[in-house]
């Protein structure tokens, strides 16, 4: 594990993202919380600093290229490089819509597109913007917070009782594939790119119905963010090991 690193966590002001930030800070790393609301991001950063962490916040809306570019510029100006990018920001459905309303037979394509904007295109936008800073690191790594809900092995199993959600589930399938594309493309650059599944965690994303705590859900991302320079790349794991593609 790297002794000290600069890490950015998108969606880091609450839920799993907050816990990822907290756990990385507890390990002695400098953490930048990316949040759509700078006020909320700074509030979380202040709380984590009060607990002894080196934590700051930056305004970052993953669906807004201008916001992402401004965040990358600020991080570059203040730190000069980035060691770990944790693409944690994600949504399950469009505000005001029902997650259960994503059945393919009745799904609204605009709803599906809205989910993909954050869960897939947002990750690509952020990763592309921060790649120059990651290239300046001695041990760069990218961690994408995906979900076993998008596992092709799981969703092709007709005995699977998980919700059929045309927006969320395929967005996580796509995110895992995006992870592999980056892992292969950046392999020769020695940038480690991996996907993790936090598990079914009680957060705003699922109405706090999850069975695990955010602290437990953060463990897989923190573990992958702190792997050594010769660690794995192109993997999809949870705290128990590999997740079926």
Language-model regions, residue ranges each:
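Canonical Rossmann dinucleotide-binding motif of NAD(H)/NADP(H)-dependent dehydrogenases/reductases
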Residues: 2-32
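Structural signature of the Rossmann-like NAD(P)-dependent dehydrogenase/reductase core
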Residues: 9-10, 87-88, 141-147, 192-197
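Conserved glycine-rich Rossmann-like NAD(P)H-binding loop of the short-chain dehydrogenase/reductase
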Residues: 27-43
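The beta1-alpha1 cofactor-binding region of Rossmann-like NAD(H)/NADP(H)-dependent oxidoreductases
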Residues: 38, 59-73
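A glycine-rich helix->loop->beta "capping" turn
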Residues: 51-54, 74-87, 93-94, 108
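Catalytic loop of short-chain dehydrogenase/reductase
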Residues: 91-92, 100-116, 124, 135-188
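C-terminal helical subdomain
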Residues: 173, 188, 195-196, 203, ...
């Amino acid at each position: 594990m790297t002794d000290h690193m600069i890490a950015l966590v998108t969606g880091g002001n609450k839920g799993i993202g907050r816990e990822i930030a907290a756990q990385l800070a507890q390990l002695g790393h400098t953490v930048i919380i990316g949040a759509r609301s700078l006020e909320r991001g700074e509030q979380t950063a202040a709380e984590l600093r009060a607990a002894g962490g080196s934590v700051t916040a930056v305004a970052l809306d993953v669906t807004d290229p201008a916001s992402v570019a401004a965040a990358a510029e600020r991080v570059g100006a203040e730190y000069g490089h980035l060691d770990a990018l944790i693409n944690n920001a994600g949504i399950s459905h469009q505000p005001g819509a029902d997650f259960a309303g994503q059945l393919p037979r009745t799904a609204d394509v605009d709803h599906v597109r809205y989910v993909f904007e954050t869960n897939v295109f947002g990750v690509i936008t952020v990763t592309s913007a921060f790649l120059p800073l990651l290239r300046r690191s001695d041990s760069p790594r990218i961690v994408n917070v995906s979900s076993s809900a998008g596992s092709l092995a799981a969703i092709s199993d007709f005995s699977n009782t998980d919700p059929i959600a045309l927006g969320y589930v395929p967005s996580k399938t796509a995110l895992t594939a995006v992870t592999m594309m980056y892992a292969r493309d950046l392999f020769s650059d020695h940038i480690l790119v991996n996907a993790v599944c936090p598990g079914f965690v009680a957060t705003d994303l699922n109405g706090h119905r999850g069975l695990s705590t955010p602290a437990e859900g953060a463990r897989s991302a923190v573990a992958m963010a702190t792997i050594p320079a010769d660690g794995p790349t192109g993997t999809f794991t949870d705290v128990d090991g590999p997740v079926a593609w």
